[in-house]
Amino acid sequence: MPAPEFAPEWRDHADPRVQYRPFFVVRLMSPSNNTNDAERGYIIPIGGAEEKLNNPEILDRFVTICGGKNARISIIPTASERDDTGRNYEKLFRRLGVRHARVLPFETREECQSSPDLDYIDKSDGIFMTGGNQLRLSTTLGGTEVAQRIRRRNAAGMHVAGTSAGAAFMAEHMIAGGAEGSTPSPDMVTMAPGLGLTNKFIIDQHFSERDRLGRLLTALAYNPFAVGIGLDEDTAAFIRPGDDLEVVGSGGITIIDPTDLSYSSMDRARRGEPVSLVGVKLHILIAGGRFLTATREAHAEQLQ
């Protein structure tokens, strides 16, 4: 089977002013609740541009976690404006040995409420959300039956992966866009409600490649209860059911922990002014590195 072709990832140009969408959407998209003592599935944000041909380590591991060749993997290409994105990932998963890979083309909110494809979510072992524009995900899927089923199934054990825009969409608080640079500033990031699989993290992607440290720091200054995950390309955080994570891939993950934040000038800074943050911890983890969320401990990769 010929290798599928993939276009370059979408680069966001959203209005950099910080804003949140209406609160009722946030309520509908609040984190998954596990009510039946089942173990939550993995949450797997990928930084974009994951290796697809020579050594697709991230996708291979996702397939293995989902059950291997007999897994049912649903692909949601809503974020992408390209007609072939979903089909290319379907071909890719089949090349990796998956017998039951299927595209679920949710393009409108009406389809997200009543499409026959809704039932396939309940049969899936894994969901994969492609890259594109995360605002297409939040405005199309947000608060719909699709989003609620994904959250319920993840709480019951189904695994959910997303690359680029699909990664940003996973958390309750989503970075929708922003500016480049390393120093935080009040107007450096745009926030919107995400899918709500977790409220423990705020996720950004294409992190080092697009110089996004400042906008993630800004997001955490507004939401200091969360841990920031900055994902380089071809790098993923495999977040386990207990919210500990392991790094997989060829790049690094920047973990920003504001637990001990003792001072922030965010409340006094004006548009365009730099913001002071004191007490923030930053870790750089590569493949094999781990972060224990409950204790806020980072561990480097094990030497062989």
Where are these regions (language model features)?
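Aromatic (phenylalanine/tyrosine) cluster motif
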Residues: 6, 20-24
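Low-complexity, intrinsically disordered or signal/transmembrane-proximal segments
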Residues: 13, 19-20
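C-terminal and late-domain segments of enzyme folds
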Residues: 26-69, 80-88, 93-95, 175-176, ...
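Portal/gating segments that form or line small-molecule/metal binding sites
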Residues: 74, 80-123, 129, 136
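Catalytic-core regions built around general acid/base machinery
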Residues: 120-123, 143-157
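Catalytic nucleophile loop
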Residues: 129-131, 150-174
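Glycine/threonine-rich flexible loop motifs
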Residues: 134-144
